[in-house]
Regions:
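Conserved SGNH/GDSL esterase-like catalytic core that processes O-acyl groups on lipids
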Residues: 68, 85, 90-91, 114, ...
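Catalytic His-Asp segment of secreted/periplasmic serine-dependent ester chemistry enzymes
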Residues: 285, 292-293, 297, 327, ...
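N-terminal export leaders
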Residues: 16, 28-41
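Surface-exposed amphipathic alpha-helices with a cationic face
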Residues: 344-352
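N-terminal secretory targeting modules
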Residues: 37-46, 53-234, 240-248, 265-270, ...
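Active-site-proximal beta-strand/loop segments in catalytic clefts of secreted hydrolases
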Residues: 107, 175, 234-237, 279-282, ...
Length: 473
C-alpha cells in the first residue's frame, strides 16, 4: 500500500489530524502512528505531528482550554457524606497554563436532589484561605449570581476577565445555602480546602474558617482562554497523586505541567501552551465499577465521555489504568491481560474517533501491596509488554521502567516507594513526570514544527527521533 499526503498550510494555520490508513511498513513504538505533512506554498517544510488525524485548525484564535480538572468519584455512603450548612467552601486549585479569561464547571452528577449555589467567586490565592487583593471576581451563570443544578447535571459559569498565571493557585469560593451533602466530590485532593463559619463569604479577602477538608466538592474543571490545547491525564490513584505530600502539587501530572512551562525544546522554544488536566481517581478501574461509597469513581469505560471528551480543548490524553482491576481480581471475578487489552482498545478507538491522541503508560510495580500475588504480577507484565509493543497506542510512557528496582523489577525502587509498595512518594512522582517524553506533545505553532535541520532524521521534528516519511510502500 502506498500512502502519500501532500498538504498546504494557509498563513497562520496549523494542521492537526484526521484518520488515515495505517502504514504497512514496520514502525517503532517511538514512532507511534505519526505522519509527516509537507507544507505548501512552494516550500518543502516537513511537519512531524502526533498521531493519525488531519484537519485544519486556526491555532492563532483564542479558545477555551482546561487548566485544571478533577474527576468526581462519589457518591459516598450517607454516613460518610460531608455536609455544609449555610457555609462557604473555598477550594484551592493549581493551574497548568495561564490565560486572560476564566470560567468554572460545577457538577451535581451524583446528587439525588437539586444543588443550589447561592454565590460563586474566583480569585488568585495568596496563601491559606486568603486571596490576592484586587483579583476577586464574582461569577454568574446565565447572568445570574446563583444557580440550581438538577440531579445529574453540570453547570458552566459565564466567563470573567482575570489574568491567570500558569502554575498559580486559584481560590474558587462557593456559598451553599441551607444544608448540602457533598455527593459529587473528588475525595483525594491532596490539597487543603477551607469551610467557613455560617454565611456567604465568597468575596472575603480572608475566609473565616471553621474547618478544613482534603477534597474538592462540586468543582470539576477550570478553563482559561488562549491559543492552546489540553492534555488529559486519565487514571487511578497513581495519577491522582495518592500519598504525595499535601499542598505541594507533587502529582506526576503537576511535574509534567511544570516541564511544559519551563523546559525548552531543541530549538530553544517552550511548549507552554498545553494545559494538563488531571482526571485520576483513587481506586479507579478500567473495566468495572468499584464498591458503592468508595469514592473510586465509575470505570474508565463509563466516565470517558465526561472526563475526556467534555474537557475543554482536549487534544492529547495519557492512559495509566489497570492495576486496581488486576489487584482486585479473584477466582470468582478474574481479570486477564486480554480483558484489559480489549478495554484499552475501546478507549483508543473512542479517543481517535474524536481526533485525540492516546499515549499508553505502563503499570508500575506493586509487589508487597496488599492485593499482590505472583499470578497477578504475570498479568501486569503481560499488559506492560503489550503497551510497549507500540502496536495500538500513539506513543508509550514507560513508568514501570522509571520506578522499578533494577535488582528486583517487581518492586518499586526503595527511594521512590511511599511505603505501601503501590504508590510512589514525592520523588517517585517527580521521576514519573520527568520521564514523560515532551516530544509526544507537539508545540502548537512552536519551533518544534519546523523543517529538518542539517543532520536530523528526515521527517523528524526532534533530533534523534525517527519518524515516517510522507510516503509509505
Amino acid at each position: 500500500m502506498k500512502l502519500s499526503l501532500p498538504a498546504l498550510l494557509d498563513a497562520g494555520r496549523r494542521y492537526t489530524m484526521a484518520w488515515l490508513p495505517r502504514p504497512s511498513r514496520p514502525r517503532t513504538p517511538r514512532e507511534g502512528r505519526r505522519i509527516v505533512l509537507l507544507a505548501g506554498l512552494g516550500l518543502a517544510t516537513a511537519l512531524a505531528l502526533p498521531p493519525p488525524f488531519v484537519h485544519a485548525q486556526d491555532w492563532s484564535a483564542e479558545r477555551w482550554v482546561g487548566t485544571w480538572g478533577a474527576g468526581p468519584g462519589g457518591p459516598p455512603l450517607p454516613a460518610n457524606t460531608q455536609t455544609f450548612t449555610d457555609q462557604t467552601v473555598r477550594l484551592v486549585v493549581h493551574t497548568s497554563i495561564g490565560g486572560t479569561r476564566v470560567r468554572i464547571r460545577l457538577s451535581n452528577e451524583m446528587g439525588t436532589t437539586p444543588l443550589r449555589i447561592g454565590a460563586a467567586h474566583i480569585a488568585l490565592r495568596a496563601s491559606g484561605a486568603d486571596i490576592v487583593a484586587g483579583t476577586d471576581r464574582p461569577l454568574t451563570f446565565g447572568g445570574n449570581a446563583s444557580v440550581t443544578l438538577p440531579p445529574g447535571a453540570p453547570a458552566l459559569s459565564d466567563p470573567v476577565d482575570l489574568n491567570v498565571p500558569a502554575l498559580s493557585d486559584l481560590a474558587v469560593s462557593l456559598y451553599l445555602p441551607g444544608t448540602v451533602g457533598a455527593t459529587t466530590i473528588h475525595g483525594t485532593a491532596s490539597q487543603t480546602n477551607y469551610v467557613s463559619l455560617p454565611g456567604d463569604f465568597t468575596g472575603a479577602a480572608s475566609l473565616p474558617t471553621q474547618r478544613t477538608i482534603l477534597s474538592w466538592p462540586f468543582l470539576t474543571e477550570v478553563d482559561v482562554t488562549g491559543n492552546a490545547a489540553a492534555i488529559v491525564a486519565l487514571g487511578d490513584s497513581i495519577t491522582d497523586g495518592t500519598r504525595s505530600t499535601p499542598d505541594t502539587n507533587n502529582r506526576w501530572p503537576d511535574w509534567l505541567a511544570r516541564r511544559l512551562q519551563t523546559v525548552r525544546d531543541p530549538a530553544g522554544g517552550l511548549n507552554n501552551r498545553l494545559g494538563v488536566v488531571n482526571r485520576g481517581i483513587s481506586g479507579n478501574r478500567l473495566l468495572s465499577n468499584p464498591a458503592e461509597g468508595s469514592l473510586a469513581g465509575r470505570s474508565i469505560q463509563e466516565r470517558f465521555d465526561r472526563d475526556v471528551l467534555a474537557t475543554a480543548g482536549v487534544r492529547y490524553m495519557t492512559l495509566m489504568i489497570g492495576i486496581n482491576d488486576i489487584g482486585n481480581s479473584s477466582a470468582a471475578n478474574p481479570v486477564s491481560a486480554n480483558d484489559l487489552i480489549a478495554g484499552y482498545r475501546q478507549v483508543i478507538a473512542r479517543a481517535h474517533a474524536k481526533g485525540i491522541a492516546v499515549y499508553g503508560a505502563t503499570l508500575t510495580p506493586f509487589e508487597g501491596a496488599g492485593y499482590y500475588s505472583a499470578e497477578k504480577e504475570v498479568v501486569r507484565q503481560a499488559v506492560n509488554a503489550w503497551i510497549r509493543s507500540g502496536d495500538e497506542f500513539d506513543g508509550v510512557i514507560d513508568f514501570d521502567r522509571v520506578t522499578r528496582d533494577p535488582s528486583h523489577p517487581g518492586r518499586f525502587l526503595p527511594a521512590y516507594d511511599s511505603g505501601d509498595h503501590l504508590h510512589p512518594n514525592d520523588l517517585g512522582y517527580q521521576a514519573m513526570g520527568n520521564a514523560v517524553p515532551l516530544e509526544l506533545f507537539r508545540s502548537i505553532g512552536s519551533s518544534w514544527l519546523k523543517a529538518d535541520a542539517p543532520g536530523q532524521n528526515a521527517g523528524s521534528a526532534v533530533p534523534g527521533i525517527s519518524m515516517p516519511a510522507a510516503s509509505y510502500k
